[in-house]
Each structure stands twice: as structure tokens, then as C-alpha cells.
A protein has these predicted regions:
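Long, charge-dense accessory insertions within large macromolecular proteins
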Residues: 162-211, 216-223, 287, 301-304, ...
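N-terminal pre-Walker A segment at the start of P-loop NTPase domains
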Residues: 207-252, 283, 287, 295-311, ...
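Glycine-rich phosphate-binding P-loop
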Residues: 249-283
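Flexible beta-alpha connector loops of hexameric P-loop NTPases
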Residues: 309, 319-340, 372-387
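Conserved alpha-helical scaffold flanking the Walker A/P-loop in AAA+ ATPase domains
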Residues: 338-350
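Conserved P-loop NTPase nucleotide-binding/switch module
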Residues: 350-394, 398-399, 411-439
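Conserved NTP phosphate-binding and transfer environment spanning the P-loop NTPase/kinase superfamily
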Residues: 399-402, 408-586
């Protein structure tokens, strides 16, 4: 049974002025009017990570309409919206400094422009819950009981009142938010049957505010996207949207077809901007982002060169033949892969773990991996060049493995011969130039010779060995942390994710680290292939939710701040673990 709010106040008054560890006496549950406060974890000192609390409001108090959380997509969208409302309420409150270190801090794990499944809020049939981090007030390392009373008995009930009760929420904004996310996911569900890998809606704003901001460029500076007629498709909407001419039940825009799509155009005309939008389009976006009508197949993977990365037992023989000194590439391992070998490994690993499409930009690719022209062929004979360029494998990837490619290429017309669709960007506006590109290829045929002598065979599966995963550090049995969106600390290992470009939230990266530990401890049995292991992780997320990711999770306690990554990013992180050991399964 929870204690009363009066009990909490009395305890805080009693420990006022005592050492900081006295705050441990408030761990537990406290019943307020229409609210239960759970104090799950108390920080060790004012400078440590904030304490973990939960605010739970019963259904009859929250009174959120059930249709807003009917089904997994709507529930995820509503939970994301509630966390954003909580963050807004915290920002709008008078900033109050309540002592040393993190004293007085209130934090919720609200996201950016993407809408993700996260643990910061939970909407159940019986209650609504917000997970909060709070810096408990202190002077030096002494408890400030009165300030803590104002925070826990005043600020937090006020936060719950404004973030979890329907009567105080912006109701139309909530409905529009949920509807927008559901529309995006409905479009995504139709892409495959329509023969598409992505959709870019008419009117979308693709450019971002700056290199340091993911917010949209101001409307008066941006060019709204407009589909070429030959590529325009139409999708019905689950929820009508308001437009200048009233409500509409369909959305139109450019369909990016399966196969090989080439995006060409001059510099600064929007090629890479389009590709980046497709890269982020694997997630739904908030209303008003400009990319809420950019929807990509969930399994599209951005590929790039990655000098210096770790590669373990990957068969890159389709792209790289035997290296000097007779070094085989059918089970390639390296602690310091080159640009070309890393890009080859990135492609093979992505396909191995379920990618249905690849996104590549010439700007971040290894030139010698992408193409070898006739003059270079004449100077450096094939017997001295182990690389079979991507140009000669891109069609086989689609025809043999059903893996599509969207490639930004402004400097090499040799790709005209292998492209199914050519999109030319002019001042941020696309037009389809497939026929023109084919005519140019016919008039001016490439003089380069095809050098691939063997077909692109099957992808060699690999079995990860659990003994190579050690999450311990010092006396800690499990020490996992995410120091940045591109860095996981896993035991004594640092996993560099700078080139895994589809992670968009620090809480995703944190979840990736714990998902690796989950996979190694529960799903790696020496027989399961990496793709099977990753699928088991995805199935675990679906069945148990992200709450259970934390190895120290205790029942209903605050699980930490997690946002759901794709299995593809979990696999990418596993592949970059420096201690990783794999066994090929042929």
C-alpha cells in the first residue's frame, strides 16, 4: 500500500539538513489526490545522475479518449505526445535553482523530430504514467527538505496535472499528432505491395534549418517538394487532413520504385538533401516537420565507407577479390578496414541482417569501390585490381537478392546503363530523366570493360559467439552506457557508431547497448545466425516492451530512458564491437 502525501512531507521535514543519503528514506510509493508518486531510485549525491521517479494517474482521472490509444501505432504516438507535453510544461515553469549540482532539475526523455517508441511514458488500459528524472535538492551534500517538499509535493503533481489529464491537454493537437503518425504508418504498410521503397509527398519541406538543427528550413526560404508527373502516386489516408481547399482523404507525391534509382543533378541542387530525407523516413515525423510525408521502407539502410572500422568474418568476395600476399576475402576480418573493404562489408552485413534497400551517396563512398573507368582499366590491369566496383554488382543485388538501391551520383554517367529510374534534381525540384539518360548511354557508350567474372552468390551467414561479449567493467558485472548518439560503452569496449547514420536519438543508442547484452545473454547459443539473433531481439521488444531491457529492471520500477532502435542498428553495433568473434555458417 502506498504511503500518503502527508507521510512524504513529514519524512522530508525530518531529514532536512541531514546527509544526502538520508533521501533513501523516501523510496517507495506515495498517494496524492488522483496521483501516485513512485520514488524508484535515489541518486547517491547531488552531482550524480538524477533520481528516477514515476507519476501515475488512474484512467478515470486522466480521462484520455480510448480511441487515441487503440492499437500499437496510436498508443506509441500518444505516449510520445504526452512526453513532449511534459517537456513543454517543465520548460514553461519558472526555473527554480534548489541547491548544489543537479538540485531542482526535472527531466523527461522527450524526442526530436522523429516519433519513436520510448519508455518515458506508458498508457495502459488502467492508468497513464510519466517517467521523470529529478535532481533532489541539496546544499553541498546536505538534504534541503523544504525545497524537496516544494518539488515533490508541488511541482510534480502540477506536472501530472498538465501533462496527463485530458482536460488540460491541447486536445485537437493531440488528435492531429496521433492521426499524423497513423497516416505515415499506413502509407509505409502499403509501399511493398505498390512496388515502392519510399514515398515523398507533394509539399514536403526537405531542407533543414542548419547543419546543427534538424528542424525544417523556414517556409519562405525552402522550396516545397513537387513530384514529377511520371512518378506521381496517390495514397489513401486513414485520417483526413486539412488543406487549403478543405479536408482531403488522399496524399500525392513521388513514389521511389524498387530497383536501381539514380539521383543526379548539379552541386547544391538537392540530391543529398533528398537522400537524407529518405534515410530519416524510416521513422514517422512530428506534424509540421516538413518530412511527415516522407515515408521509407522500414528496412532501408544508409551505406558509406568507414575507414578504420572492425570487420569480423564477412564474405566480401563479391566486391573484393583476394588481396596481396594471397589474403582471402571470403572470410574477411580486419581491425582497420579501408574505405573500399569497409563499404563492401557494410553492404554485405546489411543484406545479411534483412535490409531490403540501400541508400548511397557518392560524397561518402570510396571512389574506387563505386567505379573504375576505362582509362584506369587500361593502366591498372584487372589481375592487379582486386575490387569489383559497385557499378557491376548493383543490378545483381536487386535481381538476385531483391535489394533495391537509391544512389546519389553526380560525377559518373556509367551508372546510366544499370539504372531503372533516373531522377534529376534542379533547384530542389525533381524530374524524371530515365529516358534521356538511356539515350545518352546509347549515343555515348562507356568504353569500360565489365570485369566481374563470377556471379554475386548467396550471402554467407555468420554465427556470433556469446563469449566475445563482456559487459563488465571493474567490479561492475554489467556496465553499459551511451555517452553520445554515436558512442556505446559496453564494458571496456567503446563501440563507434559515427557511420551508423540512422540512429536519431541518444535513448536509441542507450537501448542498442542493452539490446546487445540481451542478445548475447539470451539469444546467442552458438548456433543462431546473426539475423536470427536480431529477429529474436525484435520479437522480445514486441512481446515484453523496452522496459525489460535494463538488466537491473525490477518489476514495475523506472526502466531508464530507452527509445526503440531498429534491429538493423542493433546488428550494426554488434558488427562494430572490437572484441566480436563470429563463425561463418556455410
Amino acid at each position: 500500500m502506498p504511503q500518503s502525501a502527508d507521510d512524504l512531507q513529514l519524512t522530508l521535514q525530518r531529514i532536512d539538513g541531514r546527509g544526502y543519503k538520508a533521501y533513501r528514506e523516501i523510496r517507495g510509493a506515495f498517494a496524492f489526490e488522483g496521483l501516485t508518486l513512485y520514488v524508484d531510485h535515489v541518486q547517491g549525491d547531488p552531482f550524480a545522475a538524477p533520481s528516477k521517479l514515476r507519476l501515475r494517474v488512474p484512467r478515470e482521472t486522466a480521462r484520455i479518449p480510448p480511441e487515441l490509444f487503440a492499437g500499437a501505432v496510436r498508443r506509441m504516438a500518444l505516449e510520445d505526445f504526452l512526453v513532449r507535453q511534459a517537456a513543454r510544461a517543465i520548460r514553461s515553469a519558472e526555473p527554480t535553482r534548489r541547491g548544489s549540482g543537479k538540485s531542482g532539475t526535472l527531466l523527461v526523455d522527450a524526442g526530436g523530430q522523429e516519433v519513436l517508441e520510448r519508455t518515458a511514458a506508458v498508457v495502459s488500459e488502467d492508468w497513464v504514467e510519466l517517467r521523470v528524472q529529478a535532481g533532489l535538492p541539496a546544499a553541498g551534500r546536505r538534504v534541503l527538505g523544504r525545497q524537496a517538499e516544494a518539488m515533490l509535493c508541488g511541482d510534480l503533481p502540477h506536472l501530472a496535472e498538465h501533462a496527463l489529464r485530458w482536460e488540460n491537454l491541447p486536445q485537437q493537437e493531440a488528435r492531429d499528432f496521433v492521426a499524423c503518425v497513423e497516416n505515415q504508418e499506413q502509407i509505409r504498410a502499403q509501399l511493398d505491395e505498390r512496388g515502392l521503397v519510399a514515398f515523398v509527398g507533394d509539399g514536403a519541406i526537405l531542407p533543414r534549418e542548419s547543419g546543427a538543427s534538424d528542424r525544417p528550413l523556414r517556409a519562405n526560404e525552402a522550396v516545397a517538394f513537387r513530384s514529377p508527373e511520371s512518378l506521381r502516386v496517390e495514397f489513401p489516408l486513414a485520417n483526413p487532413v486539412e488543406g487549403p481547399d478543405g479536408a482531403r482523404n488522399v496524399v500525392t507525391g513521388m513514389g521511389v520504385r524498387k530497383g536501381v534509382t539514380l539521383v543526379v543533378g548539379g552541386g547544391y541542387h538537392g540530391k543529398s538533401t533528398l537522400l537524407r530525407a529518405l534515410e530519416r523516413g524510416v521513422y514517422p515525423h512530428v506534424p509540421g516537420d516538413g518530412r511527415e510525408w516522407v515515408v521509407s521502407d522500414r528496412s532501408l539502410v544508409k551505406i558509406r565507407a568507414e575507414d578504420g572500422r572492425r570487420v569480423e568474418q564477412v564474405d566480401i568476395g563479391a566486391f573484393i577479390g583476394d588481396l596481396p600476399q594471397g589474403r582471402s576475402t571470403t572470410a574477411f576480418s580486419s581491425d582497420d578496414a579501408s574505405g573500399s573493404t569497409s563499404q563492401a562489408a557494410n553492404i554485405v552485413e546489411a543484406v545479411e541482417t534483412g535490409a531490403t534497400g540501400l541508400l548511397l551517396d557518392e560524397d561518402t563512398s570510396a571512389t574506387n569501390f563505386m567505379v573504375r573507368d576505362a582509362r584506369m582499366q587500361a593502366l591498372v590491369h584487372k589481375e592487379h585490381e582486386p575490387i569489383t566496383p559497385f557499378l557491376e554488382r548493383v543490378r545483381e543485388l536487386y535481381e538476385r537478392h531483391s535489394v533495391s538501391t537509391v544512389l546519389v551520383m553526380g560525377g559518373c554517367g556509367d551508372y546510366f546503363e544499370v539504372a531503372d529510374t533516373v531522377i534529376r534534381m534542379r533547384e530542389f525540384v525533381p524530374d524524371e530523366s530515365t529516358q534521356e539518360a538511356r539515350e545518352i548511354a546509347t549515343r555515348s557508350p562507356s568504353e569500360r570493360r565489365v570485369e566481374a567474372t563470377t556471379p554475386f552468390g548467396s550471402i554467407t551467414a555468420r554465427v556470433p559467439l556469446a563469449k566475445s561479449f563482456d559487459p563488465s567493467r571493474g567490479r561492475r558485472e554489467v556496465k553499459i552506457d551511451a555517452r553520445a548518439i554515436d558512442l556505446v560503452l559496453f564494458g571496456n569496449d567503446a563501440i563507434d557508431l559515427r557511420c551508423v547514420e540512422q540512429l536519431v536519438d541518444l535513448s536509441q543508442t542507450r537501448a542498442v547497448g542493452h539490446a546487445i547484452h540481451l542478445a548475447a545473454s539470451r539469444f546467442m547459443d552458438g548456433k543462431a545466425m546473426l539475423r536470427e539473433v536480431v529477429q529474436r531481439v525484435e520479437d522480445f521488444f514486441d512481446a515484453e516492451g523496452l522496459d525489460a531491457l535494463d538488466p537491473f529492471h525490477r518489476g514495475s520500477h523506472h526502466p531508464g530512458n530507452f527509445a526503440r532502435p531498429r534491429g538493423l542498428e542493433v546488428a550494426a553495433a554488434i558488427n562494430r564491437l572490437r572484441s566480436l568473434r563470429m563463425r561463418q555458417k556455410r
